[in-house]
A protein has these predicted regions:
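The start of beta-strands in P-loop NTPase/AAA+ ATPase cores
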Residues: 1, 82-83, 119
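Hydrophobic anchor at the beta1->P-loop junction of P-loop NTPases
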Residues: 3-5
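Walker A (P-loop) phosphate-binding loop of P-loop NTPases
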Residues: 10
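Conserved lysine of the Walker
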Residues: 13
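Hydrophobic positions on the alpha1 helix immediately C-terminal to the Walker A/P-loop
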Residues: 16, 20
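ATP-dependent small-molecule kinase phosphotransfer cores
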Residues: 23, 29-112
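Short coil/turn segments at secondary-structure junctions
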Residues: 58, 135-136
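Conserved phosphate-donor/acceptor-positioning beta-strand/loop module used by diverse small-molecule
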Residues: 86-89, 113-134
């Protein structure tokens, strides 16, 4: 089962996804987390994104490449036999790239190779309630 979690940066998605995984594991249900920036391309993408030097079109391709590599590492039987929890997925690609002025249909097209989520959750939190993870 493919379950996705979306929401603003620092809204608690990663913490929530980890808690859900732990809960499933306690119940004896196999669960795994996948999130952006875990592949080699993803790690480089994170560095470049922090520098702010990436063109929005290139970002769309690189995020899709990172997602593609992560999906290639997931066997089809895993999608049937375990809970796959994604901390960000295609909706984030659409939201971020459209906010940068990239055409919705174009972004949708390059992400059309990815399976549709079985269920998705959007963590809706007020801006002032976001978790401050940059304390130090």
């Amino acid at each position: 089962m493919l379950v996705i979690f979306e929401g603003l940066d620092n809204c608690g998605k990663t913490t929530l996804v980890q808690m859900i995984k732990d809960y499933y594991l306690k119940l004896g249900i196999d669960a795994e987390i996948s999130k952006e920036f875990e592949t080699n391309i993803g790690k480089e993408l994170k560095k470049m994104a922090k520098e702010g030097t990436l063109d929005p079109i290139l970002k769309a391709y690189l995020f899709a490449t990172d997602r593609y590599i992560r999906m290639k590492n997931i066997r089809q039987e895993d999608l049937k036999n375990k809970i796959m929890l994604f901390d960000r997925y295609v909706p984030s690609a659409l939201a971020y790239r459209m906010a940068e002025g990239v055409d919705k249909n174009w972004v949708t097209n390059i992400n059309s190779v990815f399976p549709k989520a079985d269920i998705g959750f959007f963590i809706d939190i007020r801006e002032h309630s976001k978790i401050n993870v940059n304390i130090f």
